[in-house]
Structure formats: C-alpha cells, structure tokens
C-alpha cells in the first residue's frame, strides 16, 4: 500500500495544500499545542527582533503531520520577512541551493523540508552559508579552477526532518535552535478541529470535535483530514450537522477505530501477534510479513504505536504489548480470552 493513499497517513497528500493554507495559523498566538516550543520560540523571535538580527538557524524534528511547515511559516510571519520553501530531494546540485541563497533578502527565512535527504555536495555548500553567510563557488576546473566567495545577507535556515538522527553532525551542529514536536494530546487536537471547522464554516458540536480528535493519532494533519471526510458524511446523511453520533458513524464507516488505527495498523499488530507469537521479530521479517518497506514501518507506522504503548522496541526486535492483545480481545500469545 502506498503511504499517501492511507486516510490515516500523516504524510501530506496532493490536493490538500489549498485547504491547509486556509486553515493554517499565521501567528504564534494562534498555534495550538506544543507549549514548551511556543514559549521558547516567542522569546527567541522577540529577542532577535529587538536586536535587529536574523533569527538563529532552526531545526524542527518530529513525526510527519505535527506542524513543522506551519511553524516555519509562523517564524517568517512573526519576523516580518519572506519565506522561501524547498526540500532536500529537490536540491540536487550545489547550483540549485546557490540560486536560492543568492535570491534571499536580509533576515529572510529559507525553509528546507526533509533536510536529512540533502546530497553531500549540496550540504557542503550550506556550511559556510550558515556559519559565515558566504558562498564558496568554484570557477573553472582542474589547475585553472579558483574559488570565489559571495557574501550573503544574514538569513535564517529552518530545516525540518522526521529523522533527526540521519543528519550529519556538522550540519546538525550549525543549528542554533533545535526543537522537537511531539504527538498532540486529545484536548489540543479538539481545539484544532474546532478552529478548522470555524475556518471552513462547518457546523460541529464539542462532542463531534472531540470524537474526531481522539481518533486522529495525535496528529493535526490527520485530524483536519478526518474533519473533511466527516463533513462529507454529515452533508449527505445529517444535513451538515457534525454531532458526536454523526462523527462516530462516519469514522466507523471509514474503518478508523477508537484508537485511531486503520487497516495497516491492525495488520502490523496482528502480524506480530499471530505470525510471530507476539515477538520479538526483526524489522526485515516484519516488513516482509506485511508487504511494506522497513522505512515505512520505522517512520510512519511505528512511532504512534510505540508512543501509545502497543509495540515495544527491544534489542531482539519488536514485541506486541498487553495493550495490543487487549485491543483485539486476545490473551497474550494470541489465545482467545474465553
């Protein structure tokens, strides 16, 4: 299964950008959740503005869908500067990055999503740019080649990554501010759903927002996607009114259970329980058993299941916890509770 095809995928889906921009908060005061990150960023941004400096380079890590791009937009808005956006895989050559850097105005924000996927040659260009606001460009080749330096205006690089451990130490060390976004609590997600409903002019009750929030896997992107699908259901079956009962019926129809698990989550957990007697099972064997890439399991499926206590990672492999057995009404080792 392609990850982007999953309703419960935290990955961005083509076509959602327009709606996401409409409901995305623009200021720190509108950003819900992540209180420690917000408190720190408010201080860092205010201090930089008071000094008249560019904000220190910022690295934002965390699972997909938690608001890394939103936070980058907010940083630019709060600093009152332009935001230039790109991603690691897009910057194939050093010249691609050089072109973006030389187009920046003083204190602008350059946002690089998936920064862990930068090629080594592009990353080398970043080092002097981040540290000294300079570009080192080679003119010519061989013995006749020479290096010239191009001065850059002070700017802020905001890098986003789902795999902070994959960044090289020289790159990671050049970020003055490092923030990690965590999965959201249900209460914060409920506020996000309610806010998005207002932006989209939807009729939703507090109970309806809470039901969507508690099945959204701690992820705002999923919560907003579920809200749109529940809206469709409500418009056809409930005159557009999203109550808790309507939300429950819609989400059950979409095969999203009370824990926010979809088919792939249940497939992963049941593979560990049934095919590997609860584990431990190695990642490669587990990937083969469910027909998924190991990276998809590590980066997409596992984080939420581990955070919620349904899977444990051990030196010998993955283990299904007692919570996983109880979720499926099983005793440990896959026996029937009756």
From Swiss-Prot:
DNA binds at residues 294, 313, 318. Its main location: cytoplasm. ATP binds at residues 23-24, 65, 68-70, 131-133, 174, 184, 221. Residues 4-184 are annotated as: Large ATPase domain (RuvB-L). InterPro entries: AAA+_ATPase (IPR003593), AAA_lid_4 (IPR041445), DNA_helicase_Holl-junc_RuvB (IPR004605), P-loop_NTPase (IPR027417), RuvB-like_N (IPR008824), RuvB_C (IPR008823), WH-like_DNA-bd_sf (IPR036388), WH_DNA-bd_sf (IPR036390). It is an enzyme of class 3 (hydrolase). GO terms for cellular component: cytoplasm; Holliday junction resolvase complex. Keywords: ATP-binding, Cytoplasm, DNA damage, DNA recombination, DNA repair, DNA-binding, Hydrolase, Nucleotide-binding. Residues 258-338 are annotated as: Head domain (RuvB-H). Pfam families: AAA_lid_4, RuvB_C, RuvB_N. It is found in: Cytoplasm. Transmembrane segments: none annotated. Disulfide bonds: none annotated. Residues 185-255 are annotated as: Small ATPAse domain (RuvB-S). Its EC number is 3.6.4.-. It catalyses: ATP + H2O = ADP + phosphate + H(+). GO terms for biological process: DNA recombination; DNA repair. The RuvA-RuvB-RuvC complex processes Holliday junction (HJ) DNA during genetic recombination and DNA repair, while the RuvA-RuvB complex plays an important role in the rescue of blocked DNA replication forks via replication fork reversal (RFR). RuvA specifically binds to HJ cruciform DNA, conferring on it an open structure. The RuvB hexamer acts as an ATP-dependent pump, pulling dsDNA into and through the RuvAB complex. RuvB forms 2 homohexamers on either side of HJ DNA bound by 1 or 2 RuvA tetramers; 4 subunits per hexamer contact DNA at a time. Has 3 domains, the large (RuvB-L) and small ATPase (RuvB-S) domains and the C-terminal head (RuvB-H) domain. The head domain binds DNA, while the ATPase domains jointly bind ATP, ADP or are empty depending on the state of the subunit in the translocation cycle. During a single DNA translocation step the structure of each domain remains the same, but their relative positions change. Belongs to the RuvB family. NCBIfam families: PRK00080.1, ruvB. Homohexamer. Forms an RuvA(8)-RuvB(12)-Holliday junction (HJ) complex. HJ DNA is sandwiched between 2 RuvA tetramers; dsDNA enters through RuvA and exits via RuvB. An RuvB hexamer assembles on each DNA strand where it exits the tetramer. Each RuvB hexamer is contacted by two RuvA subunits (via domain III) on 2 adjacent RuvB subunits; this complex drives branch migration. In the full resolvosome a probable DNA-RuvA(4)-RuvB(12)-RuvC(2) complex forms which resolves the HJ. This is Holliday junction branch migration complex subunit RuvB. The lineage of its organism: Bacteria, Pseudomonadati, Pseudomonadota, Gammaproteobacteria, Enterobacterales.
């Amino acid at each position: 299964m392609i990850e982007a095809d999953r309703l419960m995928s935290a990955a961005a889906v083509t076509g959602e950008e327009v709606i996401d921009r409409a409901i995305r908060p623009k200021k720190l005061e509108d950003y819900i959740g992540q209180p420690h990150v917000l408190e720190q960023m408010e201080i860092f941004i205010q201090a930089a503005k008071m000094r008249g400096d560019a904000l220190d380079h910022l690295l934002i890590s965390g699972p997909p869908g938690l608001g890394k791009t939103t936070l980058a937009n907010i940083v630019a808005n709060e600093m009152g500067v332009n935001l230039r956006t790109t991603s690691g895989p897009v910057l194939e050559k050093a010249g691609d990055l050089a072109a973006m850097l030389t187009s920046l105005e003083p204190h602008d924000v350059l946002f690089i999503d998936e920064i862990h996927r930068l090629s080594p040659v592009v990353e080398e260009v970043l080092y002097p740019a981040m540290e000294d606001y300079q570009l080192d460009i080679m003119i010519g080749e061989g013995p006749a080649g020479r290096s010239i330096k191009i001065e850059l205006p002070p700017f802020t690089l905001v890098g986003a990554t789902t795999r902070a451990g994959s960044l090289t130490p020289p790159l990671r060390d050049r970020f003055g501010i490092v923030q990690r976004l965590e999965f959201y609590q249900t209460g914060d997600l409920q506020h996000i759903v309610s806010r998005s409903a207002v932006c989209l002019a939807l009729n939703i009750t507090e109970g309806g927002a809470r039901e969507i929030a508690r099945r959204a896997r701690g992820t705002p992107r999923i919560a907003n996607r579920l809200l749109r699908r529940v809206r469709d259901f409500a418009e056809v079956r409930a005159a557009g009114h999203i109550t808790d009962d309507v939300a429950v019926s819609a989400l059950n129809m979409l095969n999203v259970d009370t824990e926010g698990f979809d088919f792939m989550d249940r497939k992963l957990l049941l593979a560990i329980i049934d095919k590997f007697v609860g584990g431990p099972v190695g990642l490669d064997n587990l990937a083969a058993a469910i027909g998924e890439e190991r990276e998809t399991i590590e980066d997409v499926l596992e984080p939420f299941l581990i955070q919620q206590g349904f899977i444990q990672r051990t030196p010998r492999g993955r283990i299904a916890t007692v919570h996983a057995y109880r979720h499926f009404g099983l005793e440990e080792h896959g026996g029937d509770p009756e």
